[in-house]
């Protein structure tokens, strides 16, 4: 598959397919023409010795300092070197790859003044899978993701570290190996590379993809739990959900009915009890609300993926050219969205932990043994798996605190309000990793509970899931190191996302 970039129409589904199929990037001719036109404006500014921020002046507090024309290119290299102050563990290779795609896409809008050489260098790095090593910490989320994107830019000019064919190498060595020259930054290009929200947005895209997948995975896991507890299926009837109007809730209820169709373990209202606890009865309402959040996040991310968030921006209208210093680099819209994503995923984990508690609690699990122990007393069974899940959801409650309500001044109070969007992105992904493990714990426990109930009673669809995951997690016949089971399921759930055939 080839992903065609035009600066206007990139979607998250495009990114997902690109990652699944190890695709290449091609650029639409019209987009290249826009790049040429915006670059011509920069060249005219230089020729006419105009005063324009970041082209003929310094940056931030130094915006009033005029730069000698012989030092315009040096200014851009100095910018990249000085701003590469990222700290901590690097972003994943998927996030770094998406970051390059998003930065390339915004340059193709033709408002940044980049050269074709810069555009082609980004395309080369993407297609050859030369992945810049980009530390996660150090961004305030306005003026964009300066520190992370500076590390990306370092790789392009042959000064940074990269991951290439599974090995960490100097960018310059990889370029030499591939007979490719480092990029020679021209006026405006350093700024064009780092003034933007691509770090938070790239992490947000990966987080959205994995969060949405977790939402779907949580449904069949919940269906296993539901059957193991002889849950009441009436609560999922279409007429119940249609009168509330939330389409996502209606959709979850329909999928739950589909997962449970043909089960002999489900019950009807008043057959065993009149109604179930909320964690079973309200799955469509709770999970559906998370999908509402995911849909909002997707919309915001796709707006930003196709946005011009550089500064200054170059415009041409009716044969008139003008360059405007604005603030499209400010990450507030994405920061809000990613804080919402944290809430949506946290709730999937919260309700999962409460469901698995019902499976192991002898006061709540019907006729199942306490903690599903094969020999209660001598063997503890799933007792501490519930502890682990409780620990993860409690950690999520701390991580879910909104990063976007925080701000701190920088650059001598010139940049006096920031979004903290990249912090929201980082914390959000940790919540996703935690939630995936909570769902993995529910899966391990629900598999055992279903076995004790009798797998012949499972619906055909959940029976297939049972068989699929029993190949990863064997029956619990005695106490063992359950962390291995949990991690095996969590990794299997994650790996399925980037395969062309999804697991759910």
From Swiss-Prot:
Location of this chain's protein in the cell: Cytoplasm
GO cellular component annotations of the record: cytoplasm
Reactions mediated catalytically: L-histidine = trans-urocanate + NH4(+)
Cross-link (5-imidazolinone (Ala-Gly)): 142-144
Gene coding for it: hutH
Sites of 2,3-didehydroalanine (Ser) modification: 143
Name of the protein described by the UniProt record: Histidine ammonia-lyase
Organism domain of life: Bacteria
Pfam families: Lyase_aromatic
Chief location category: cytoplasm
């Amino acid at each position: 598959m080839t992903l065609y970039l035009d600066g206007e129409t990139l979607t998250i589904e495009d990114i997902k397919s690109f990652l699944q199929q190890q695709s290449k990037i091609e650029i639409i001719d019209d987009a290249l023409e826009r790049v040429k036109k915006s670059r011509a404006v920069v060249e005219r500014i230089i020729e006419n010795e105009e005063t324009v921020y970041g082209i003929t002046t310094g940056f931030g507090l130094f915006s009033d300092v005029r730069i000698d024309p012989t030092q315009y290119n040096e200014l851009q290299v100095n910018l990249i070197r000085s701003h590469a102050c990222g700290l901590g563990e690097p972003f994943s290779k998927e996030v770094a790859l998406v970051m390059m795609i998003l930065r390339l896409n915004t340059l193709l809008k033709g408002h940044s003044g980049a050269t074709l050489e810069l555009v082609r260098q980004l395309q080369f790095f993407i297609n050859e899978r030369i992945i810049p090593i980009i530390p996660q910490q150090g961004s305030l989320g306005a003026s964009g993701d300066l520190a992370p994107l500076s590390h990306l830019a370092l790789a392009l000019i042959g000064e940074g570290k990269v991951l290439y064919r599974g090995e960490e190498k100097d960018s310059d060595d990889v370029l030499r190996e591939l007979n490719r020259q480092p990029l020679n930054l021209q006026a405006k290009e350093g700024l064009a590379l780092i003034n933007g929200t691509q770090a938070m947005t790239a992490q947000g895209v990966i987080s959205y993809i994995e969060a949405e997948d977790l939402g779907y995975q949580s449904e069949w896991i919940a269906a296993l739990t539901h059957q193991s507890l002889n849950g009441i299926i009436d609560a999922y009837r279409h007429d119940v959900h249609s009168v509330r109007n939330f389409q996502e809730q209606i959709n979850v209820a329909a999928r739950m009915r589909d997962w449970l169709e043909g089960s002999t373990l489900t019950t009807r209202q008043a057959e065993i009890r009149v109604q179930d606890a909320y964690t079973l009865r309200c799955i469509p309402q709770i999970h559906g609300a998370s999908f509402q959040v995911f849909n909002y996040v997707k919309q915001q991310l796709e707006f930003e993926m196709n946005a011009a968030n550089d500064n200054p921006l170059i415009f041409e209208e009716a044969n008139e050219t003008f360059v405007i210093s604005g603030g499209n680099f400010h990450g507030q819209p994405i920061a809000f969205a990613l804080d919402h994503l944290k809430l949506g995923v946290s709730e999937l984990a919260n309700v999962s932990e409460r469901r698995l508690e019902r499976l192991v609690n002898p006061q709540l699990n019907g006729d199942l043994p306490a903690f599903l122990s094969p020999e209660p007393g001598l063997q503890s069974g799933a007792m501490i798996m519930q502890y682990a899940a409780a620990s993860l959801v409690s950690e999520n409650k701390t991580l879910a605190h909104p990063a976007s309500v925080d701000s701190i001044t920088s650059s001598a109070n010139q940049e006096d309000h920031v979004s903290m969007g990249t912090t929201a992105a980082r914390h959000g992904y940790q919540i996703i990793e935690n939630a995936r493990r909570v769902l993995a714990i529910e899966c391990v426990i629900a598999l055992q509970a279903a076995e004790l109930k009798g797998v012949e009673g499972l619906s055909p669809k959940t029976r297939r899931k049972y068989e699929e995951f029993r190949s990863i997690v064997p029956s619990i016949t005695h106490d063992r190191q359950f962390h291995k089971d949990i991690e095996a399921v969590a990794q299997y759930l994650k790996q399925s996302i980037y395969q062309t055939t999804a697991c759910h």
